[in-house]
Amino acid sequence: MARRVLLVRGGALPRQSGLGRAHHELVDRLKAGQIPGYELADVIEHSTGGNPLQRWWRRRKSHPKTVHRAVWDAIDGGTADFVHITDQEQAHLVPAGLEVACSVTVHDLFHLSPRTIIGIEVGDHAPNGTRKKDLNHLRNGLARADMLISISESTAEECRELWPEKPVSVVHHAIDPEPYQIEGEIGLRNFVLLTVGSNEPRKRLDFIDEVVDALPQDVRNDLNLVKVGSHLKLSDDELIAAYQRAEALLFPSAGEGFGLPVLEAMAAGCPVLASDLGAHNEVADPSMLLPPTDKTAWVNAIIELHEAWKERGEEPPKPDKTALNRAAEFNIEDWGEKMAAAYDSMFEN
């Protein structure tokens, strides 16, 4: 008989957000039976919006009470077997005082453990008093959890250092390649390179600007640098078409919990030039990694792409086999087996 998972989060973030997407994919895969031996019991969440005071009250007071009551009712009523909280920013919701197993997905620890990477501050180094209290509640919640499920090896190692007695499992994100291999249409011309992400400093788009400035003039004349997210908004279908049309995704980030654009690009057959930093260096094929601050290495890699584009007669690229093969390693079947093993371990210990 399948064990029933009660999924818990805070605000009902949409699929378009990073944490929202991960949550919805977990819901979908539980419903589809893609985690062997487990099925969805229910989802506990609240609506978003409201003024700052309303949001604080909901986060710190009303929703934790709602979750506690719902967990009690589900366990007592026999409709759920354990609780899974779908991101570390909701770890304060780990039930206290209830005899129920609980796991938490940890996407990253940037805010709980801010750091400086290659001179760039990652995470909030100066939280205000309210946020400091909130972070303490999150730490306490993670300490109460029976299992932490990390989406990367690098974050898992941090978890083991912070909570050395806590069981930690690694379950990388997975991807369904089919939508990424349906040929799309987008009006991009010339020598196309992509960046995907926000303008926040850790994404290091300023480094890409420096690399572009250092390119030979003939490469710059042909270059069509498309900055998705920070400058240009695309639909999901348009983004897939952009990956298919691009010579490469440029991903110089100083730090990621996972680096989903890297996996998406490879699933679409798009090569990647990525900084050799965690955790996206666990995702990209090793041949696609570059020293994060070596501008010359990035310039030379782009020149090679430009030469290949010229030799091809400036035709759009064909899907890159290295990218496709690497993306295939992050398949949903393996993901489901690893998630099931993580859940199983809570009941074995």
Residue ranges and their predicted role:
Residues 1-349:
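Carbohydrate transferase catalytic cores enriched for Leloir-type hexosyltransferases
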